[in-house]
Swiss-Prot record:
It comes from Meyerozyma guilliermondii (strain ATCC 6260 / CBS 566 / DSM 6381 / JCM 1539 / NBRC 10279 / NRRL Y-324) (Yeast). Residues 1-21 form the signal peptide. It comes from the Eukaryota. GO terms for biological process: cellular response to amino acid starvation; meiotic cell cycle; negative regulation of TORC1 signaling; positive regulation of autophagy; TORC1 signaling. Keywords: Meiosis, Signal. Residues 25-89, 121-182, 233-262, 661-693 are annotated as: Disordered. GO terms for cellular component: GATOR1 complex. The lineage of its organism: Eukaryota, Fungi, Dikarya, Ascomycota, Saccharomycotina. Mediates inactivation of the TORC1 complex in response to amino acid starvation. Required for meiotic nuclear division. InterPro entries: HTH_NPRL3, Npr3. This is Nitrogen permease regulator 3.
Length: 787
């Protein structure tokens, strides 16, 4: 198993709310969550793994993430953990108002749930109606009479009484219908009422990540609770406020949404969309964090936004409740209830679509209040370096340093080169990608890296018509025409100008970037450098030669019947007898150029080919450094001649040489200051090896006996490094003024991180001028080629 292989581990989605009557179950999907089969599987798995977990001292199985940091469950002693079920029920008070109700250990919680399940399934009425011990009676204090705490005042005894009355009302039905009804009232073997109590935390634990693990099943979500004034979200204070808005004493601006929240304020106080997962133990942290970051948090914020603006969630809850009553009156049972709700409730349909898409690694396109929202866990099909041979990855993955362009945006998920290299952390994907529900848009990092995307092109991963149909776009819409205009040989900047002039579309660079980001996020396009016959391409080390080669040979032959076969075409690009050459060397004539470029795009799409990029470092030889040192010495000597020592200074030096009483002074503050200045002065370069004394009358220049020096960042060169560079330009290479201009454009790319191909795209430098400059300074650069 590997982080590069998608594994959502999603079992189902469960929606619960909290009203003045307490926690309530609204909808769950899929229907298989409520079945005797899953219940028996849960109990069997619990019996098989209980001893194993105790012997191996497994980490805490139940945790609740609060707003700041995760808290450890160390509150129970070893003696308390060894209590039997009966002792636990008699000595421990399980009050939903108490924080220990949510912070218990796995064994305590399962003992409680299993005992209640046995009691509920018991056939004897006397056993069901047996009085509870005084320790389990509800304890209600005056401190917890606030509206927020009233939502969680159901204790174990109250839940048991409700079950007893429910079982007594259904005692006249036959045994088959009773068992079916019991299956409908549980989720993975847990009673819905108990899960509602667990999954409706106090308000202090809402509006933040909530995670609890019960019997290897993870219940994770983002519970959303309304504020004291009934609003569901708050904004920071802005310059201009609308009429009717209220500013609190702490500087927060609350929206006056009395029209939409007056009803829900008195009824629904919290809603919680819970995702139920069963991830592998080794990948537990990573899979849960991945699901929460990409899907759960964003979907919860969207629902909060719609609830705040349009009271959407509460209206759907009332509709679902009414639909359940209508269905039971018409059918007499719950057969087909899920399908009935999905067909008539947009929220139920969104939950269903979300589960089916995410569990299949697809993109969930949800219509939330008639607005299209897309959610997904990005699949790792792009790598910036070659993974280890033992690290699994998806066939046809793309290998290129170009993927670093979107590494921090959250639009793509770069693959891991080592097994479990991220150690369960999403630190590389979480920054730079945030979903602001108040702004109702997906915001990406607007730094210089994402600005460079206009110099790149898009490679469509599917047929344009299929993409337009899949994203539900109108055929004549702006994005549809943009998709039809995409060519892998043209940059987005050129495409924007083309749309403005020829297609008569008012498309600016920002809109083109937005379209490109959406296509990348929807997995319909890939960012690449524009394909060119002058570039060098090789067979990718990650080419799917052992997976899809035979099928792709047929597909390549069907798409390009006039071209050589796929193996022969790949041999043209990476012949073992010669170095890689420009792609133009493989094209027979100009008439074949277009079809060969299309074939190159096809190979790039399926991961068979990658582009070789050229990276350059600027090298400073020892000869250059010695010449610069001589120039500095001559400059220092000239300064001495132009500024001779005055008689007073000469007399002072003689006095210091003959007067022994001043020896302590000469060895004291002045020399100490000189040494301190020299020590504290920042070096020009770690490899410069030159130190200059701050005393103008005693300049010491020291040249360390080292070899050549590579300047790591010429764009931010120090004064000494600039002298080295000028010595190369004007004395060693003697560049013409035109070449000097090209050199300074080229200088900031000599860091080994930015390729020369990017220089050609951004700085408007011709290949001829670049080749001429490279030939002139070839003795002072180090160049390498890789993907």
């Amino acid at each position: 198993m590997s982080f590069n292989i998608p594994n959502p581990s999603l079992l189902g989605i469960f929606l619960v709310i909290s009203t003045h009557s307490g926690p309530t179950s609204v909808f769950s999907y899929p229907p298989e969550l409520s079945s005797d089969k899953t219940s028996s599987q849960r109990r069997n798995r619990h019996e098989d793994n209980e001893d194993y977990n105790d012997q191996n001292n497994a980490p805490e199985e139940q945790k609740t993430n609060v707003k700041v940091d995760d808290e450890d469950d160390d509150g129970l002693s070893s003696e308390e953990s060894d209590f039997s079920d009966e002792q636990f029920l008699l000595n421990e008070e399980w009050d939903s108002r108490n924080v220990n109700y949510y912070m218990g250990t796995k064994k305590d919680l399962l003992s409680f749930l299993d005992d209640e399940e046995k009691r509920r399934r018991s056939s004897g009425k006397e056993r069901l109606r047996a009085p509870l011990s005084p320790e389990l009676q509800p304890v209600i204090s005056q401190e917890n009479n606030s509206p927020s705490s009233n939502n969680l005042k159901k204790t174990v005894s109250e839940v048991s009484d409700s079950q007893q009355s429910s079982s007594s009302r259904n005692s006249g039905s036959n045994r088959k219908s009773s068992s079916a009804q019991t299956a409908k009232d549980n989720i993975l073997g847990f009673d819905k009422e108990y899960l509602c109590e667990l999954l409706c935390p106090p308000r202090s634990m809402c509006n933040s990540r909530f995670e609890i693990t019960v019997d290897d099943h993870v219940f994770i979500g983002l519970p959303v609770h309304c504020y004291d004034n009934g609003s569901w979200r708050h904004k920071t204070k802005t310059k201009s406020t609308r009429s009717g808005s209220k500013v609190s004493a702490d500087g927060q601006l609350y929206e006056d949404s009395q029209n939409s929240n007056s009803t829900s304020r008195a009824t629904m106080s919290m809603f919680h969309l819970v995702f139920i997962m069963d991830p592998p133990v080794v990948e537990y942290n990573y899979r849960v964090d991945e699901m929460f970051h990409f899907v759960i948090s964003r979907l919860a914020l969207v629902l909060r936004y719609e609830q705040s603006k349009h009271d959407y969630v509460w209206k759907q809850v009332k509709l679902i409740s009414k639909l359940k009553e209508d269905h039971r009156l018409s059918q007499g049972n719950d057969e087909g209830l899920h399908e009935f709700l999905v067909n008539r409730s947009s929220l139920c349909r969104s939950i269903k679509d979300c589960y089916e898409a995410i569990s299949k690694h697809d993109i969930a396109n949800l219509f939330v209040n008639k607005k299209l929202r897309s959610f997904q866990i990005p699949i790792k099909t792009e790598f910036h370096s070659l993974p280890e041979p033992t690290v699994p990855h998806l066939p046809g993955s793309y290998l290129s340093t170009t993927v670093n362009l979107l590494a921090g945006t959250g639009l793509i998920n770069i693959g891991e080169t080592t097994r479990y290299g991220m150690q369960g952390s999403l630190s590389s994907i979480t920054p730079g990608s945030t979903y602001d529900a108040d702004e109702d848009s997906l915001q990406t990092d607007s730094g210089s890296k994402t600005d460079d995307i206009i110099y790149f092109s898009l490679l469509l991963l599917d047929d344009p018509n299929s993409i337009i149909r899949d994203i539900n776009a109108e055929p004549q819409s702006a994005i549809a025409r943009f998709i039809h205009s995409i060519k892998p040989t043209e940059s987005l900047e050129r495409l924007a100008h083309k749309l403005n002039h020829h297609e008569k579309m008012e498309s600016n660079i920002a809109e083109v970037k937005s379209f490109a980001f959406h296509l990348v996020y929807w997995r319909r396009a890939r960012v690449i450098q524009p394909l060119s016959s002058r570039s060098v391409y090789i067979v990718s080390p990650m080419a799917p030669l052992s997976f899809n080669l035979y099928n792709d040979i047929k597909a390549f032959k069907a798409a390009f019947s006039s071209l050589p076969s796929l193996p022969h075409f790949l041999k043209l690009l990476s012949a073992s007898s010669r170095k890689p050459k420009q792609f133009a060397a493989a094209i027979p004539s100009k008439d074949h150029r277009d079809i060969y470029m299309e074939a190159l795009g096809w190979l790039m799409k399926y991961g068979y080919v990658t582009q070789l990029h050229t990276f350059v470092w600027l090298k400073i030889s020892k000869k250059i450094k010695m010449k610069v040192e001589e120039d500095i010495e001559k400059e220092s000597a000239g300064r001495k001649r132009s500024n001779p020592v005055t008689p007073s200074v000469e007399k002072y030096h003689k006095l210091l040489a003959t007067d022994n009483t001043s020896k302590a002074y000469s060895d004291g503050p002045s020399d100490a200051n000189i040494r301190r200045t020299r020590a504290n002065k920042p070096s020009s370069s770690p490899s410069s090896g030159i130190g200059v004394n701050s005393n103008p009358y005693n300049t010491d220049i020291v040249l360390e006996k080292d070899g050549d020096t590579i300047i790591l960042d010429p764009g931010r060169a120090s004064s000494l490094e600039r002298k080295w560079i000028n010595k190369i330009i004007f004395d060693e290479c003697k560049l013409t003024p035109a070449m000097v201009s090209v050199f300074y454009k080229f200088l900031k790319y000599m860091n080994g991180k930015n390729s020369l191909e990017l220089l050609l795209l951004k700085e408007n430098v011709s290949r001829h001028d670049l080749r001429k400059l490279m030939f002139a300074i070839e003795d002072h650069i180090i160049s390498v080629r890789h993907w």
